[in-house]
Swiss-Prot record:
UniProt region (Disordered), positions on chain: 396-426
One GO cellular component term: sperm flagellum
Name by which UniProt lists this protein: Tektin-1
Keyword Nucleotide-binding applies: no
Keywords per UniProt: Cell projection, Cilium, Coiled coil, Cytoplasm, Cytoskeleton, Flagellum, Microtubule, Ubl conjugation
Subcellular location: Cytoplasm, Cytoskeleton, Cilium axoneme; Cytoplasm, Cytoskeleton, Flagellum axoneme
Species of origin: Canis lupus familiaris
Length: 426
């Protein structure tokens, strides 16, 4: 216990001075290190603050550039979308024109088919495969060909409209994404250190698995623009093709319609001329029948007129047989009477032969009269079919020039383009 209460050892004055100096030196060294750290920290703070400001400024510039780039592509997409929409609307109008053109061909085809059916009702020798029938068959063939061509063209237009709508969908989807991206980047660009709602986010510095490179991003939008351009150019080419097809087919149909009308006119002219000639021959035959009938009457009278002289001659011969004895002489009178009887019989025979020939000729003339009358009726029937039924019906043909038949012309007329600033009319 006495050891525990012993006083602490005392230091020498030199030790006290040395200890104080050591404290001074340590304090000075510590302070010096601290000052250097403070200076270094301040320099570091200034450097980091400057770097941060520069980095944030650079990010702001990059965001601004990005916004401009997205706005540029958004405008490109907007322009292409507007052009594509206008072109598609034009194609829809052209599709309607083709449908109207196809519909308007039904009546001309029906008229042509009815004309062929009517002309099948011609009778006799007039049921001929003439130029009119050839032109009608050609007209039906032309109409069928035009309808097939218009149908194929309408299928092409329908397919092009589908492709345009596909390109339009891609543009709209791209535009929608770019609008969202613009909104997001615009919000990011407007943020600053004092903005409310800024916060820390865990694992923010990462590469999104579905993200794309800048080159892929550019290629994506550029592909959409190029596809829209390609479909628009294809649409413009198709519109020009439709205009040419409608114009050319209208000319072909109208030309063939004129050929049929001309054939009808020439056919009617020829048939009327044949009818008139037949009627003239019929009149001559009927006149000849009257002459032949008169001739037969004359011949019959001549035969009857020979009965008197024949009876006289026979009576004389019979009476002279009663002469007595030697007076029953074959004298000159007797020979002359015998000769007279023969002459009369011969003349009557000749007259009867002429009468028989006249009867044969009269029968032939009567048959010819009936044949000519039938042929005139055949020609009248043909004229009725061609002029009254066919020609009259063809006056309502929409393919004819002039008149009120403007249905085909309206269907085939070019439609002003919306891209030219004009309204669509059909």
């Amino acid at each position: 216990m006495a050891k525990l209460l012993q006083p602490s050892p005392k230091f020498l004055p030199e030790e006290w001075h040395i200890a104080n100096k050591n404290q001074y030196h340590r304090a000075e060294a510590q302070r010096s290190r601290s000052e250097r750290l403070v200076a270094e920290s301040q320099r570091l703070v200034d450097e980091i603050e400057k770097t941060t400001r520069k980095s944030q400024s650079d990010v702001n510039k990059k965001l601004e550039q990005r916004l401009e780039e997205v706005r540029f592509w958004k405008k490109e997409l907007d322009d292409k979308l507007e052009q594509l929409v206008c072109t598609t609307e034009d194609l829809l109008t052209y599709q309607t024109r083709l449908q109207n053109a196809l519909e308007s061909l039904k009546e001309p085809l029906h008229i042509t088919q009815m004309c062929l059916e009517y002309r099948d009702k011609r009778i006799g020798i007039d049921l001929v495969h003439d130029e009119v029938e050839q032109e009608l068959l050609k007209e039906a063939e032309v109409i069928h060909g035009v309808m097939a061509l218009l149908t194929r063209t309408m299928d092409e237009v329908t397919e092009q409209i589908r492709l345009n709508r596909s390109a339009k969908y891609n543009l709209e989807k791209d535009l929608k994404d770019k609008f969202v991206a613009l909104t997001i980047d615009d919000v990011c660009f407007s943020l600053n250190n004092n903005s409310p709602g800024i916060y820390y986010s865990d694992s923010v510095v990462r590469v999104e698995p579905h993200s794309v490179s800048l080159e892929d991003w550019l290629d994506f939008s550029n592909t959409n623009v190029e596809k829209a351009n390609r479909q628009r150019n294809n649409s413009l080419a198709l519109k020009a093709l439709v205009d040419r097809i409608l114009s050319q087919t209208a000319d072909d149909l109208r030309r063939q319609c004129d050929m049929v009308d001309t054939a009808f006119q020439m056919g009617l002219k020829e048939t009327k001329a044949a009818r008139d000639q037949l009627a003239a021959h019929l009149a001559k035959v009927m006149e000849e029948i009257a002459c032949q009938e008169k001739n037969m009457t004359v011949l019959e009278k001549a035969i009857l007129d020979q009965e008197g002289p024949a009876k006289v001659a026979h009576t004389r011969l019979e009476t002279r047989t009663r002469r007595p004895n030697v007076e029953l002489c074959r004298d000159v009178a007797q020979y002359r009477l015998v000769k007279e009887v023969g002459e009369i019989a011969q003349n009557v025979g000749r007259l009867k032969e002429a009468l028989a020939q006249a009867q044969v000729e009269l029968k032939g003339l009567n048959r010819r009269q009936l044949a000519l009358q039938e042929e005139v009726q055949v020609k009248e029937n043909t004229i009725y079919i061609d002029r009254v039924l066919c020609t009259h019906m063809r006056k309502s043909n929409p393919l004819r020039d002039g008149g009120d038949q403007g249905q085909w012309a309206r269907a085939c007329a070019p439609t002003p383009s919306a891209e030219d600033g004009t309204s669509h009319t059909d």
